[in-house]
């Protein structure tokens, strides 16, 4: 579960290294975000000489959470870190590569481009 003030790793090569969630998109009083949800975040740590700079406000899709998600077959999928992929207004990733595994549920939320770039889909 990701809430405002939560820090996330960035799972792509957009230039950001760490993000801090400042808003969970959805209904007006939504408190938590999970895998496949869109958030508004601020770049807290960035790679030098890349398009994204520190203190830039971006949109991101959550691809991994420590809390995990429960599937219909009873399996619970948990990851080692909280991670997100920086996206543009249309939901397409800003980077050209995605690092680490992502959940299969992203395909259900129409983030097929992120799923196709990922090296491993669990």
From Swiss-Prot:
InterPro entries: Ribosomal_uL14 (IPR000218), Ribosomal_uL14_bac-type (IPR005745), Ribosomal_uL14_CS (IPR019972), Ribosomal_uL14_sf (IPR036853). This is Large ribosomal subunit protein uL14c. Binds to 23S rRNA. It comes from the Eukaryota. Its main location: plastid. It comes from Staurastrum punctulatum. GO terms for biological process: translation. Part of the 50S ribosomal subunit. Belongs to the universal ribosomal protein uL14 family. It is found in: Plastid, Chloroplast. It holds the Pfam family Ribosomal_L14. HAMAP family: Ribosomal_uL14 (MF_01367). GO terms for molecular function: large ribosomal subunit rRNA binding; structural constituent of ribosome. GO terms for cellular component: chloroplast; cytosolic large ribosomal subunit. Keywords: Chloroplast, Plastid, Ribonucleoprotein, Ribosomal protein, RNA-binding, rRNA-binding.
């Amino acid at each position: 579960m990701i809430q405002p003030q939560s820090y996330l790793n960035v799972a792509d090569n957009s230039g950001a290294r760490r993000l801090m969630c400042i808003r969970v998109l959805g209904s007006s009083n939504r408190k938590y975000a999970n895998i496949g949800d869109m958030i508004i975040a601020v770049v807290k740590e960035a790679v030098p000489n890349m398009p994204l700079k520190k203190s830039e406000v971006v949109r991101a899709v959550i691809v991994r959470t420590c809390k995990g998600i429960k599937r219909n077959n009873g399996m619970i999928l948990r990851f080692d870190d909280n991670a997100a992929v920086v996206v543009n207004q249309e939901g397409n990733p800003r980077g050209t590569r995605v690092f680490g595994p992502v959940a299969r549920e992203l395909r259900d939320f129409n983030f097929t481009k992120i799923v196709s770039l990922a090296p491993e889909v669990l």
